[in-house]
Amino acid sequence: MQKHIVKDLELLAANAAAKEGFEIIRLEVLAQMKPMKIQLQIRHKNGSDVSLEDCSRLSRPIGEVIENSKLINQSYILEISSPGLSDILETDKEFATFKGFPIQVSTKNKSNSTILQNGLLHTKSKEHLLINIKGKMSKIPIDNVIQVRLASPTD
């Protein structure tokens, strides 16, 4: 399948999902399957868990925008799911469990702007989050941390 079609599908799905309060984490088109399969992973914009009912509810508007776009001229199966475990780290147990894993840290600076930093999780204390950024340890004050999210190694 041509890359521009996949990009167009991602944009259409993202817009439809946003109207319902969701964001698309991943869209994959398995064009070699018969019928073709379009797989979407979603999450709530507010970070809450995604239910089976949420996936079902989002299926109709996303299916409609795909059909109306005429980008796909063959039969397909639309699968909508959640990515599984929440990728946002919140509890001390989660921070301990995912030590050494790639993370993305959202922080605020003095001017209240949001900054994203990617690195490997080292430790979290009441005062600091310690992450390894390209071999260099970075100590981030907990008061500046907005959110810590598991990331893929390529992020």
From Swiss-Prot:
One GO location term (cellular component): cytosol
Keyword Cytoplasm included in the entry's annotation: yes
Family matches, as Pfam families: RimP_N
InterPro entries tied to this protein: Ribosome_maturation_RimP (IPR003728), RimP_C_sf (IPR036847), RimP_N (IPR028989), RimP_N_sf (IPR035956)
Cell compartments where the protein resides: Cytoplasm
Top-rank taxon, per record: Bacteria
Keyword check for Cytoplasm: yes
A biological process term (GO) from this entry: translation
Keyword line: Cytoplasm, Ribosome biogenesis
SUPFAM superfamilies: YhbC-like, C-terminal domain, YhbC-like, N-terminal domain
Family stated for the protein in its record: Belongs to the RimP family.
Function as written in the Swiss-Prot or TrEMBL entry: Required for maturation of 30S ribosomal subunits.
HAMAP family named among the record's database cross-references: RimP
Record protein name field: Ribosome maturation factor RimP
Species annotation: Prochlorococcus marinus (strain SARG / CCMP1375 / SS120)
